[in-house]
Amino acid sequence: MKIIFATEPIKYPLTGIGRYSLELVKRLAVAREIEELKLFHGASFIDQIPQVENKSDSKASNHGRLLAFLRRQPLLIEAYRLLHPRRQAWALRDYKDYIYHGPNFYLPHRLERAVTTFHDISIFTCPEYHPKDRVRYMEKSLHESLDSAKLILTVSDFSRSEIIRLFNYPADRIVTTKLACSSDYIPRSPAECLPVLQKYQLAWQGYALYIGTMEPRKNIRGLLQAYQLLPMETRMRYPLILSGYRGWEDDVLWQLVERGTREGWIRYLGYVPDEDLPYLYAAARTFVYPSFYEGFGLPILEAMSCGVPVVCSNVTSLPEVVGDAGLVADPNDVDAISAHILQSLQDDSWREIATARGLAQAKQFSWENCTTQTINAYKLL
């Protein structure tokens, strides 16, 4: 079996899709069933899996400003959308006996043996959670991927059912390959976490934690409103720590963040390096994730793997991931979310049960299983 794997999602900052791509390709590279693995980036082959580095210098900042400018040019974006898949197809013209896997929705133009991973279809079902330019771009490109793919992988049974329902896609051509988290996410002692806690000026089990992109789909505004309902004494004892890449703008959200920061019960850490995250999770009192829509919900799996109680929403894929280990609520019910957060902070009996159940639930997910399921899916072609 010969595979070409697209590596574009493996870049800083490493999103959930980037993490999936990185963990999967590392294991495909050593899988016995894979006779040959080629890495494809942009429209050319590369020799090594990309390194994820913090691009915080001025050169990277200039690059980011250039990309932001280009994204505001609809004609350039449309030209890229039309031409780039054809450039890729031309570069792949002599590799018809390979299976091509695009792990982030997109595929080159008209390949004979193409697999794509659809992580969710919120661009179609909940377009209000995305910038309009992203919706315009992805709607067209994802329809083309659906037409081109001989097989679709997806990361949850929820996402699989959504694709079948919305697009009437053949069920035998969609395979669920559930995600996992890094082996770095394990329970840790206060001493192990101390360097990271000191770095961010935090206390062991002295905070509630949210990790994820700061964007409307994640319902962070609802989370802040729910947290604001807690007694001020509780909020000051357990401040809400927010960490994640700043997504598309939500002015009301940032006004709430700034207000909570002034009052002393919110801190926004920005994008935290990967090497710090397992310790930031493991030292938290509780993890909160009341998202409106998820294709999987990797952060709650990471939290459970660290032995941290979880409060999350009861919609889309999240119940599938959390099982009976966490407290779940309607993401629109701020009062219920607030009550669950309070219980997760103060109810020691429930916390002990939630920790044990979370660790057991997390063991059901592994990158080895994901890789095996992916390779078995390749065999269907």
UniProtKB/Swiss-Prot annotation:
It catalyses: alpha-D-mannosyl-(1->3)-N-acetyl-alpha-D-glucosaminyl-di-trans,octa-cis-undecaprenyl diphosphate + 2 GDP-alpha-D-mannose = alpha-D-mannosyl-(1->3)-alpha-D-mannosyl-(1->3)-alpha-D-mannosyl-(1->3)-N-acetyl-alpha-D-glucosaminyl-di-trans,octa-cis-undecaprenyl diphosphate + 2 GDP + 2 H(+). GO terms for biological process: O antigen biosynthetic process. It comes from the Bacteria. GO terms for molecular function: glycosyltransferase activity. Changing E302A: No effect on activity. Pathway: Bacterial outer membrane biogenesis; LPS O-antigen biosynthesis. Keywords: Glycosyltransferase, Lipopolysaccharide biosynthesis, Transferase. Its EC number is 2.4.1.349. InterPro entries: Glyco_trans_1. The keyword Endoplasmic reticulum does not apply. PANTHER family: GLYCOSYLTRANSFERASE WBBK-RELATED. Mannosyltransferase involved in the biosynthesis of the repeat unit of the lipopolysaccharide (LPS) O-antigen region. Catalyzes the transfer of two alpha-(1->3)-linked mannose residues to the product of the WbdC enzyme during the synthesis of the adapter region. Belongs to the glycosyltransferase group 1 family. Glycosyltransferase 4 subfamily. This is O-antigen chain mannosyltransferase B. It comes from Escherichia coli.
